[in-house]
Amino acid sequence: MYYQQELETMLESDLSDLQLTRLRELTQYVYDNIPFYRKSFDKAQIAPEDIKTLADIKKLPFTVKQDLRDAYPFKMFAVPNSQVVRIHASSGTTGNATVVGYTEKDLKSWGDCFARFIVAAGGSKESIVQVAYGYGLFTGGLGAHQGAEALGCTVIPMSSGNTKRQIQFMHDFKSDILCCTPSYALHIGESAADDGYNPPQDFAVSAAILGAEPCSEGMRKEIEEKLGLRVLDIYGLSEVMGPGVACECDRQNGLHVCEDHFIVEIIDPETLLPVPDGQWGEAVFTTITKECSPLIRYRTRDITRIVPGICECGRTFRRIDRIAGRTDDMLIIRGVNVFPSQIEEVITQFEEITAQYQIVLTSKGSLDHVELQVETVPDFPFDEVRKLEALTKEIGKELKGNLQVAVTVKIVEPKTIARSEGKAKRILDLREGR
């Protein structure tokens, strides 16, 4: 099933023609309406008319988050304030926020993109969509809401938190699509079981569209088992559009990028050169339909890759892999680059361990120390010292084998690690001077 079949199944040649037309229009548009881009193009000695093929996008300069902060509040807007119908901003705690404006057309495009993936998840206008992302300046809640309303669904705008009420509504109203973060979906599953529910039998939810944080395959399976549904990973970021830039279909084999709205590149974050399809690198997006806050070659810092080939679902848009991490949340442990998602992939292989974990960084003098705290499942015999020691040793062995670095493992009892109703805090940095 498709929401916009003609667009979602375009021939590659037709899509390339559409992208080129929109890219050429975009470069002229930002040159004429955003002084930052006029100055940036002039400095790079590139003019809008120099863009003759899609490959010419590599001639255009990158845009980074600091550029948006420096432009606070309105300098990256391409339209007058009278045409801005909504503003979203990043949740950063240092410096100026990164602000993104939306026109009516921008919001319609956003709604259409998200609606495509509700349909891909098996939803329809008959669906009851429970939105448990946060509402506000964060794009998650309103993005999912926008997509559900575009499709004609019934929306329950729960926002995040109030988990008991969340579970009650999910049960009583028979919600069939859940939208939230992976860690919160896991928390809902655990809490529902604690309240005496058997989610696979007691709930009508058939799919969860989860985003805003990485979700390993192991964590996906745990959520699916606890809630009795299918998990689809959705991708977005506030600077580009919020959730709906890309999402999995029911094949769960890569996230389809809405390529009629975005051009995606994967680059080596060190050399800034493109990498071949299938190779991991940093995702870079160009927004080719946005009116208020268009972006040229925006460096996301998100690590992914292009999944080669065409998906069996019939959608022809290229796919990216699930986000492995960010270049700025990468840990360097004794010279080895490690992403939290790599650790998650290892620990979720153990039946005795849940997907809840926290990485604690401490320091003594010039030496950094890394401790991984993981929780056991409720029925693990925590008081049997030999079993506990054996499991600790086995997890440490697997981590070293996969990461090529030793990590101290601390196994804690169930419900020890704080739960999050939004994005999970996976790294606790207690190092001196941090």
Question: Language-model segments: which ranges?
Answer:
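Nucleotide 5′-phosphate-binding alpha/beta core
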Residues: 1-89, 94-112, 116-120, 124, ...
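Conserved strand-to-helix beginnings and helix N-cap segments that scaffold or border functional pockets
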Residues: 141-142, 182, 220-221, 264, ...
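AMP-binding/adenylate-forming catalytic core of the ANL superfamily
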Residues: 178, 289-403, 422
